[in-house]
Amino acid sequence: MSFDTDQDADGIALGVPDWVAYELRRDEWAGGKSHKRPSRWSTDPDLHQRGIAPDDSSYRNSGYSRGHMCMKSHAAGMGAAADRETHTVLNACPQMQRMNGGIWLAIEYLTGRWANEQGAVWIVTGPVFTEASRNWIGDLYRLLMPVLTGSEEVAARR
């Protein structure tokens, strides 16, 4: 989670992951299949109470979707618990559904295919924000989260 993104000690919390990193092996790629999605996204109650992390309601009626940083079906091959643990707001960034179900999804499938072809890949994913087009969701008096305008994903072979 981002607690102070510009390292100037002003304590700006963005409420989204700075990045996620994980290894995806050939035998773990579920080919887009995953376990049943829970009806609500979980959060860390302590971080939410402190105004550092969002909760499921932060996205409600925002017009934005919760974009997984670690793809749900990437984790599905690691087991039901890993699959379920991707369904937390600590693993999500607000984004337009057009991006989430479009280029973002295509990149997630591409890295899964690379894991099949190469045997394993390390994946590092993080949000990109631009000042000019920054939109926010959440509670003005609690925690505002920026809507990402892009993402960076690096995949490297073992």
Spans of model-derived segments:
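Short, His- and charge-rich active-site/binding loops that engage polyanionic ligands
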Residues: M1-R66
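Domain-level detector of nuclease and nuclease-like folds
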Residues: R40, L47-R158
